[in-house]
UniProtKB/Swiss-Prot annotation:
Record-annotated site: Transition state stabilizer: S98
Binding site for Zn(2+): H88, H90, D101
The organism of origin for this protein: Pyrococcus furiosus (strain ATCC 43587 / DSM 3638 / JCM 8422 / Vc1)
Modification after translation: The disulfide bridge probably stabilizes the PfJAMM1 homodimer at the optimal growth temperature of the hyperthermophile.
InterPro entries named in the record: JAB_dom_prok, JAMM/MPN+_dom, MPN, VirAsm_ModProt
Regulation: Inhibited by EDTA in vitro.
Name of the protein in its database record: Desampylase
Keyword field: Disulfide bond, Hydrolase, Metal-binding, Metalloprotease, Protease, Zinc
A Pfam family annotated for this UniProt entry: Prok-JAB
Molecular function via GO: metalloexopeptidase activity; zinc ion binding
Function of the protein: Metalloprotease that displays desampylase (DSAMP) activity, cleaving ubiquitin-like small archaeal modifier proteins (SAMP1, SAMP2 and SAMP3) from protein conjugates (isopeptide- and linear-linked). Thus, likely regulates sampylation and the pools of 'free' SAMP available for protein modification. In vitro, is also able to cleave non-physiological ubiquitin (Ub) substrates, such as 'Met1-', 'Lys48-', and 'Lys63'-linked Ub dimers (Ub2), and to remove Ub tags from diverse proteins.
Required cofactor(s): Zn(2+)
Catalysed reactions listed for this entry: an N(6)-[small archaeal modifier protein]-[protein]-L-lysine + H2O = a [protein]-L-lysine + a [small archaeal modifier protein]
E.C. no: 3.4.19.15
């Protein structure tokens, strides 16, 4: 599995190419269920986006398909990429972490990019002390 950042993750900025952010927003704008996937790259810089099927097929929560997750993680490892973050959408809600997101952030202590169908997006990180902090997003 590719390495992911440790729980003492100190990056305060997520750097994402504009075409990747646009691709995520485009899929989210036409989806009736939460969209999810991985942000792969190096440190805090996104070099690849990988959509993963939401196996819950739900408009209010997501769970990445385990087989697709494994395949994506193996591909990233072959490409020497790390898990920079996880992205998912909220439908008809602001892009802020929910209680369920907080639980996921404890399991995956990386940046979480949350977007909605209005084109709003924010990124978040969970500290070791379970404090959620907003992460600045730089679109290149």
């Amino acid at each position: 599995m590719p390495s992911s950042s440790k729980s003492d993750f100190s990056f305060s900025t997520l750097i994402i190419p504009q075409h990747y952010l646009r691709a995520i927003l485009k899929v989210v704008s036409s989806s009736s269920v939460e969209v999810c996937g991985f942000l792969f790259g190096k440190e805090n810089r996104v070099l690849k986006v990988r959509f993963i099927r939401n196996r819950l097929n739900s408009p209010v929560e997501f769970e990445m398909d385990p087989e697709e997750m494994l395949k994506a993680l193996e591909e990233a490892e072959q490409e020497n990429l790390e898990v920079v973050g996880i992205f998912h959408s909220h439908i008809a809600c602001p892009p802020i972490p929910s209680g369920k997101d907080l639980e996921g952030m404890k399991r995956w202590p990386v940046i979480w990019l949350i977007v909605n169908e209005k084109g709003e997006y924010k990124a978040w990180i969970l500290s070791e002390k379970n404090k959620i902090s907003e992460v600045k997003i730089v679109v290149e």
